[in-house]
């Protein structure tokens, strides 16, 4: 009965999100594998040279642009973070993070799932040049994790899928905070003041409920530039922009107009082909239906396929390729061990222990329909840290510490793969055990 209620509570938006993210996870994995294959083939020199190719335009002696790698990591990933920000705002206002009762359990789980891996890594790499990489195993890749959980189908309770999604959203928010606090260097306050001015203008537009997305996006570009110049990673600008996008919907008059158009269409005669009148009515219905959506919903709907099927796979292809040969030093500090143990051990232990203790102390309550064994399984899948972990590794290790960056990427791939396989097998076995008991 409780499971049925949970399933009914899962909105259509959330179901569509699961489907798109799960497919995106599979596509992401294929691109990561392809990157490793190309980086270790006869094409490896061309592969690595490609990402350092400058792309932009020249004005006299002045070049405006970036390398392809920077375009992907700083510009395209800003759109990915904009999508993340929109998802977080939606969940905070209307979803599983909209009340303390709903949010407390997954948020506490996310905190435990970030602290434990970070501590494991830091303990192993303390007082070394690689200690700054503690943020790498703290992240969860929602696309990969959902890709695995959706392959298990009905063997996994719907309530567990909701929990994992909410945990991953809270984890993304935590990762954004970590990036802003620990991976910011050489702050330039003049540019920060410029960014603050842009944010104030965005806040005024939000207050006025400006429904056109164009002013927000144009100001978002300016905000990105100011934040990029300030020393804070530019993707933070995308998250701030997301929180400034209005979520209010228009008055009920639009609903009435939509109903009248629906009645008009129903009254028209139907044939093998649509008449000109029917086509015009359907076009009007489409326009009115779009107008009923909030700017946040419209932007999220637009960005979802771009993020899932283009930006993240391209990021994976550009960043996952590591040439594994005799020149790579896998023993650089304890990066390999720190990342793998952080993802495979720290994530499940952190999530399980902090939620177990918080429930015993009556701080929060476990969602109905989920056992502690399920929580442990979700913790294992949360150890799939691919996209955000790769992103943080690029911030943590500069070109001067290239060996550590390459080892971290190998560790992320291995740790994520181990977590995904063990998590999937564990949840599969858990379902089989439950079926035998029945």
Curated annotation (Swiss-Prot):
GO CC, alphabetical: plasma membrane
Substrates-to-products reaction catalysed: Na(+)(in) + 2 H(+)(out) = Na(+)(out) + 2 H(+)(in)
In the record, the note on similarity to other proteins reads: Belongs to the NhaA Na(+)/H(+) (TC 2.A.33) antiporter family.
Give membrane topology per the record: Multi-pass membrane protein
Q: Which UniProt keywords apply?
A: Antiport, Cell inner membrane, Cell membrane, Ion transport, Membrane, Sodium, Sodium transport, Transmembrane, Transmembrane helix, Transport
Chain's role: Na(+)/H(+) antiporter that extrudes sodium in exchange for external protons.
Report the gene name: nhaA
Q: Any idea where this protein resides?
A: Cell inner membrane
Query: Which coarse location class describes where this protein primarily resides?
Result: membrane
Q: Which residues cross the membrane?
A: 23-43, 62-82, 104-124, 133-153, 162-182, 185-205, 221-241, 302-322, 337-357, 372-392, 410-430
Biological process (GO) annotations held by this record are:
regulation of pH
PANTHER family documented for this protein = NA(+)_H(+) ANTIPORTER NHAA, SODIUM ION/PROTON ANTIPORTER NHAA-RELATED
Q: Name one Pfam family in it.
A: Na_H_antiport_1
Q: Which InterPro entries match?
A: Na/H_antiporter_dom_sf, NhaA
This chain's protein is named Na(+)/H(+) antiporter NhaA
Q: Which GO terms describe its molecular function?
A: sodium:proton antiporter activity
